[in-house]
Amino acid sequence: FMMVDDFWGEAEWHDFYGAIKQVFPDREPVELPYEHPIFHCVYDLPNKPQIPSLGAAQAGRSRGITWERSDAQEVHYKGIFDDKGRMMVMVCHNTDLGDGWEREGQDPWYFKEFSEKLAYPLGINIVFYAMTH
């Protein structure tokens, strides 16, 4: 199981897509709907969360902006599946789960809003899903 995280916008998507097609030339990333178990299996998330980097969160805090650039406003969670329907790759585009996991000691507001409520629960769901499917 591989998880890809923290790449934003169209240019970085195209770079990723070109690279992953070299690994899986016959597989397409499929958008995961909100109803997918990965968003509900342990923690029932209220939506498909967009976790900004710490810097982007601080810069956009007063306006409620969670994206890092204008072409990255919509979060995408995609999966690449094997022939038996098992997810091999989880793609987290236009979001930064890693910052939600690693920046908890740097800003109490960021920790409460993004780490506790979104990044940790989704991370636990991803690990649980990967280990049980």
Please identify what each model-predicted range represents.
Residues 1-133:
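Mature catalytic domains of secreted/periplasmic carbohydrate-active enzymes
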